[in-house]
UniProtKB/Swiss-Prot annotation:
Signal peptide: 1-17
Protein name (record): T cell receptor gamma variable 4
Organism expressing this protein natively: Homo sapiens (Human)
GO biological process, one term: innate immune response
A single Gene Ontology CC term: external side of plasma membrane
Gene: TRGV4
Length: 118
């Protein structure tokens, strides 16, 4: 059984935060259940701080999955997120990749990345 993960990289900026611009691209990914998918967040030159990944599914509020702390090079998962399901790597100050493992149909949705200094 195949299904699509719709991936949209968009810039999200809370009004109270100093924000950085993101270069976004829209990408649809189709993978089989049980496989993995990788999506890339393209960052504006000189982006630092925290890079957040969100999942938005139809009829639900966006859910933050994790964030990458570029100051300590660490990944912080949101409460309730299974370790090993998501991971990030490749922060080169130009992009950050997130891998989704052991895909299930419920992983389908729109994924967003956002960055700001905190």
């Amino acid at each position: 059984m195949q299904w699509a993960l719709a991936v949209l990289l968009a810039f999200l900026s809370p009004a109270s935060q100093k924000s950085s611009n993101l270069e976004g691209r829209t990408k649809s990914v189709i993978r089989q259940t049980g496989s993995s998918a990788e999506i890339t967040c393209d960052l504006a030159e000189g982006s630092t701080g925290y890079i957040h990944w969100y999942l938005h599914q139809e009829g639900k509020a966006p859910q933050r999955l994790l964030y990458y702390d570029s100051y300590t090079s660490s990944v912080v998962l949101e409460s309730g997120i299974s370790p090993g399901k998501y991971d990030t790597y490749g922060s080169t100050r130009k992009n950050l990749r997130m891998i989704l493992r052991n895909l299930i149909e419920n992983d389908s949705g729109v994924y967003y990345c956002a960055t700001w200094d905190g």
